[in-house]
Amino acid sequence: MTVIDVNTGKNVGKSSLGETVYQNNMEAAREIARQLRLRDIGGIIVIDFIDMEDKAHRDMVVSILRQALAEDKTPTQVYPISDLGLVEMTRKRIGEGLVESLSDECPHCHGMGYIFENRIK
């Protein structure tokens, strides 16, 4: 399971708090879709966007996320924001995971641990 927590950081903006939160969440939705593709992350993914009061804003952020993920060839399913403000989604796993792709079988324990490849040491 992958969990993503969105925060404003230092980006507090010059507009109202609600508008700043909305803008940050929209930007985060696009970037999350990009990072999921780049890192080939699959399985269950939970996103904790910054709390938004306006239902239209919440719906738009989920819509932006769905649009950004539509560019991905990997099948995804995005569910509406829950009462706790979480977006749950699934993304089909394709290929091996990050650890498996960047490591070799340990010659001492025969696969019970990992030895990272020389290129990432």
Give, region by region, the residue ranges found by the protein language model.
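Conserved glycine-centered short motifs in functionally critical loops
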Residues: 1-121
